[in-house]
């Protein structure tokens, strides 16, 4: 199933930019299994691509049902991520306390990540 989704992703990528070599991105994505989280910054760092292209690729991954979008709160004080993942922005609490430093965290500080399905 995963190989079929990767194959569909490659086709979509080639439609958009036929002359680009996507092998490093495909290799990166193949390391993940169902339930793993993919962080956009990890793709940028590992594959050496900018954030705009990273999110374009991740949106194509969503299109072929390779990943789902998740939201997680990030503490503005200690910069740590929370331990709860939300399926939408509106599902997140408006206020919560950081599990690491205890400071109040408001909804403005969050990160978009992707869960492999």
Where are these regions (language model features)?
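Short amphipathic alpha-helical interaction segments
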Residues: 51-57
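Long, charge-rich, low-complexity intrinsically disordered regions
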Residues: 1-14, 41, 45-46, 56, ...
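Residues at alpha-helix boundaries and short interhelical turns
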Residues: 33, 48-51, 65
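Positively charged, polyanion-binding regions of nucleic-acid-associated proteins
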Residues: 18-37
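Generic detection of long, well-ordered alpha-helical segments
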Residues: 15, 19, 47-51
């Amino acid at each position: 199933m995963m190989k079929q989704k990767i194959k569909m992703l490659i086709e979509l990528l080639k439609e958009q930019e036929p002359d680009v070599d996507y092998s490093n991105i495909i290799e990166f994505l193949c390391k993940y299994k169902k339930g793993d989280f993919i962080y956009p910054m990890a793709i940028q760092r590992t594959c050496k691509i900018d954030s705009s292209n990273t999110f374009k690729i991740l949106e194509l991954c969503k299109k072929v049902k390779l990943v789902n979008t998740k939201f997680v709160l990030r503490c503005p004080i200690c910069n740590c991520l929370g331990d709860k993942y939300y399926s939408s922005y509106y599902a997140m609490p408006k206020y919560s306390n950081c599990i690491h430093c205890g400071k109040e965290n408001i909804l403005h500080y969050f990160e978009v990540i992707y869960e492999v399905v």
